[in-house]
Curated annotation (Swiss-Prot):
Biological pathway: Phospholipid metabolism; CDP-diacylglycerol biosynthesis; CDP-diacylglycerol from sn-glycerol 3-phosphate: step 1/3
EC primary class: transferase
Record bears the keyword tRNA-binding: no
GO terms assigned for molecular function: glycerol-3-phosphate O-acyltransferase activity
InterPro entries linked: GPAT/DHAPAT (IPR022284), GPAT/DHAPAT_C (IPR045520), GPAT/DHAPAT_LPLAT (IPR041728), GPAT_PlsB (IPR028354), Plipid/glycerol_acylTrfase (IPR002123)
UniProt protein name: Glycerol-3-phosphate acyltransferase
GO CC field: plasma membrane
GO BP annotation list: CDP-diacylglycerol biosynthetic process; fatty acid metabolic process
Gene from which the chain derives: plsB
Residues spanning the signal sequence: none
Catalytic activities: sn-glycerol 3-phosphate + an acyl-CoA = a 1-acyl-sn-glycero-3-phosphate + CoA
Family statement: Belongs to the GPAT/DAPAT family.
């Protein structure tokens, strides 16, 4: 580089260093994009901009990537390390690639023709200052193609809202070998790069935002809403104008009022907030979502719902991953001042808890959601309908998912893909409130003063986790499950086909399973699992470290799913981090430390344990069977797991099918054997290892309460085979509450209504309850026999004494009196 050019770049870099603070996407490009720093890199930028080049250079130097201002020396040839595809501020879609970029591409391709060992990486990079999509009807916003003056003001105003995004590399060796090295290939390469940047820009910025009143006018003109308004006027005996005004009021209540400036400013505030409240936000698998957005998919984000923080955290993460924040379905309870107006400008649209008896509202909401899809906006909704109070996934509510499929059946929207998302925390600010509600306290209404009280609790929140699960493309899903689904497409009116409801239910289950497939284990939920497994909720430091190591090795060596994230830290490091969170106490004496989970916090910590219970429930079941039988064959153990597994699968949204189960169980047995928790004797007999009995017992305790709940329901069914479903669920809960008092079981989900409902439904599906509602006693007795052998005698005695038939209890009482 000539000396005058160096001076020029240094002078230009001085104000940029002050004004520009770019965020890198992805945050670790070398690892996430698998960049080979030993091979030469040619940086490809969309258009000529020295400011963009220097912003790129700053990030390259920070990431130990080659300096784009240095020339690439290949043999006797020197070529620039960067290339601009376009050369100026003109309308992007109509400008052809400039000859200079084609010339540089051709020079590099020619080098590959003459040097068979050469393999240069093309690294596409885009630099964005601001991401406002603009409003419909306005002139094009200043997104990318800016002249010098426009660029100066963009940097001045948006320099701290800039992004440098790296894409996957392209091998020039592959291009040269597969497509040749002549000038037409260089032209094609430049043209493909231009298309890549155009798609990437749309994925990052999104479609233009609607003018709110024009959107309402379009909705009011739809045939479905016109009919609903007429029906409203007729059934309520009001004027058509009054019914129409009701419809407008409902639209005002529902519709978002998305504002880029609010998103940008809130991003600054939230960034400051997260840095002070959280020790880190861990994001996994975001690249797969960026790829889908760039390929033109309509994205529906379906996260689990742990906290009110979920809304803000996910939008913040998506924005900083180079994606458009979605329109979010939020409960109407959050539409209070000042949160409601702010959420609305951040993309929230509000939904009532029930549509029952309000056809006009249901129609307007369905049409509004369909319009969002038709315009290409990403959407977010919580499948569970509300925040989980137990830390487990709730049964999915399918209303909004049904409307999503209805939008697809209009035939108007782009390909819709659902993104299951696991959101996890080391501290949930509402967890104490959840515990009170599960004990029967009335749910507090959200409002300004409650929000202020909540903000006061925001401190020392540890780590946060946002894991993007395996996407579910709806068209592909329907092609596989309902090949004739296209016959039901109707752009005017939705007619519910026979396959619709069963398919929605199956799809909702798959979404929940995929959420669990991407769970995040962390220091808090692992320590909580171990301490809650101890009878006295206390372990020595050595015992706790041993147990943490057991869990970590299980998750690493016999992973539940490939997307599950397991801490890279050692057990010692995890424990130190957990102790810093002030959730556990340490009792020190001359013999060492004892880690204690105080009784008043135990019920709160079950929430965190339940976040990952599905990851450890099968190894826990295997450990439980081995402990209670002491000696058992693999075949017998597998048989017992197979008979219990359907109940676990339904309750915890587990991923394994019945056919996959034997291989999974064998893998887990091998891992437990490798850890010396159990021993594999001759003839395939499995026995416990006395030297490692404690970690095996703690592992087994993880499923203890779950098996007791199943035994309660089975015992009641055996005692009264004709018991009605409602009475069975009610008496199961009552018996569970009694058992929890008598035996000190301090877990809110132990007598949760939804858990027993799921269990009873599964028993019916698995053939334990007939279509007429009566128990099939041969089956229920067989299952209860298996469960009974896995419980302590005192627990079994309590269950059986309470669930005996009334006449049996009378006889026993008379015998005692006599």
């Amino acid at each position: 580089m000539s000396s005058w050019r160096k001076i020029y770049y240094k002078l230009l870099n001085l104000p940029l260093k002050i004004l520009v603070k770019s965020k890198l996407i992805p945050t670790d490009p070398i690892t996430e994009l698998r960049l080979d720093t030993t091979r030469p890199i040619l940086y490809v930028l969309p258009y000529h901009s020295k400011a963009d080049l220097l912003a790129l250079r700053q990030q390259c130097l920070e990431q130990d990537l080659p300096d784009p201002l240095n020339l690439l020396e290949i043999g006797d040839t020197e070529l620039p390390s960067y290339v601009f595809i376009d050369n100026g501020p003109r309308v992007f879609r109509y400008c052809a690639p400039k000859q200079e970029s084609v010339k540089i591409f051709h020079a590099y391709l020619d080098l590959h023709r003459n040097n068979p060992n050469l393999d240069i990486q093309l690294l596409p990079v885009s630099v964005m200052f601001g991401r406002s999509p603009g409003r419909e009807g306005q002139n094009a916003p200043h997104l990318r193609l800016l002249n010098g003056i426009q660029k100066f003001f963009a940097i001045l105003w948006l320099g701290r809202d800039s992004f440098v995004r790296f894409s996957n590399t392209v091998s020039l060796r592959y291009m040269a070998t597969e497509h040749g090295t002549d000038k037409t290939i260089a032209h094609k390469l430049a043209r493909v790069a231009r298309m890549h940047y155009s798609r990437q820009r749309l994925a990052a910025v999104g479609p233009r935002l609607p003018v709110r009143q024009e959107l309402f006018n379009k909705l009011l003109a739809s045939k479905a809403i016109e009919k609903a308004v007429s029906d409203e006027a007729r059934t309520k005996k009001i004027s058509h104008e009054k019914a129409r005004q009701n419809a407008i009021n409902m639209m005002e209540e529902i519709a978002a009022n998305f504002s880029y400036e609010t998103v940008r400013l809130s991003g600054r505030v939230l960034g400051w907030t997260w840095n002070r409240l959280y020790q880190g936000i861990n994001v996994h698998n975001a690249e797969r979502i960026r790829r889908l957005a760039q390929d033109g998919h309509e994205l529906v984000y379906a996260p689990c719902h742990r906290s009110h923080m979920d809304y803000l955290l996910l939008s913040y993460v998506l924005y900083h991953q180079g994606l458009v924040p979605p329109h979010i379905a939020a409960g109407i309870n959050l539409n209070f001042w000042p949160a409601g107006p702010i959420f609305r400008r951040l993309g929230a649209f509000f939904i009532r808890r029930t549509f029952k008896g309000n056809k006009l509202y249901a129609t307007i909401f369905r049409e509004y959601l369909g319009e969002l899809f038709a315009r290409g906006y990403s959407v977010e909704y919580f499948m569970e309908g509300g925040r989980s109070r137990t830390g487990r996934l709730l049964d999915p509510k399918t209303g909004t998912l049904s409307m999503t499929l209805q939008a697809l059946l209009r035939g108007e929207s782009r390909p819709i893909t659902i993104i299951p998302i696991y959101i996890g925390y080391e501290h949930v600010m509402e967890v104490a409130t959840y515990a009170k509600e599960l004990r029967g306290a009335t749910k507090e209404k959200e409002g300004f003063f409650q929000m202020i009280r909540g903000l006061r609790k925001l401190r020392n929140l540890g780590q946060g986790y946002v894991n993007f699960g395996e996407p579910i493309p709806l068209i592909q899903y329907l092609n596989n499950h309902v090949p004739s689904w296209r016959d039901s497409i109707d752009p005017i009116e939705f007619h519910r086909p026979e396959w619709f409801n069963p398919t929605v239910n199956q799809l909702s289950e798959k979404i929940m399973v995929n959420i669990n497939n991407t769970a995040a284990a962390n220091a808090i939920n692992l320590c909580s699992t171990a301490l809650l497994a101890s009878r006295q909720r206390a372990l020595t430091r050595e015992q706790l470290l041993e147990q943490l190591d057991c869990y970590i090795q299980l998750m690493r060596n016999a992973p539940y799913a490939t997307d599950v994230t397991v801490p890279k830290k050692t057990a010692e490091e995890l424990l130190e981090h957990a102790l810093q969170m002030d959730k556990f106490e340490v009792d020190k004496d001359s013999m060492g430390d004892i880690i204690i989970l105080p009784r008043d916090r135990a019920v709160l910590m079950t929430y965190y344990r339940n976040n990952i219970q599905h990851l450890l429930v099968l190894p826990s079941l295997i450990a439980c069977i081995v402990i209670h039988h002491r000696r058992i064959s693999r075949e017998a153990l597998l048989s017992q797991v197979a008979i219990i597994y359907p109940l676990l699968k339904a309750e915890l949204f587990m991923r394994y099918s019945k056919t996959e189960l034997p291989e999974v169980v064998n893998t887990l047995i091998n891992e437990l054997t490798r850890q010396c928790l159990i021993c594999n004797k001759e003839h395939g007999m499995l026995v416990l290892n006395p030297a490692r009995i404690r970690p095996l017992q703690l592992l087994a305790a993880g499923i203890r309460e779950t098996l007791q709940r199943y035994a309660i329901t089975l015992s009641l069914l055996n005692a009264n085979p004709v018991i009605s479903r409602g009475v069975l669920e009610k008496e199961s809960r009552m018996l569970a509450q009694r058992l929890s008092v008598l035996h000190g079981i301090n877990a809110p989900e132990f007598f949760d209504k939804a858990v027993f409902t799921t269990s009873v439904n599964t028993l019916r599906e698995e053939g334990y309850i007939s279509d007429s509602g009566n128990a099939i006693t041969a089956n229920t007795q067989e299952l209860y026999q298996v469960l009974g052998e896995l419980m302590s005698p005192e627990i079994r005695l309590t269950i059986e004494s309470v669930s005996l038939p009334p006449e049996h209890n009378d006889t026993e009482e008379s015998a005692r009196e006599g």
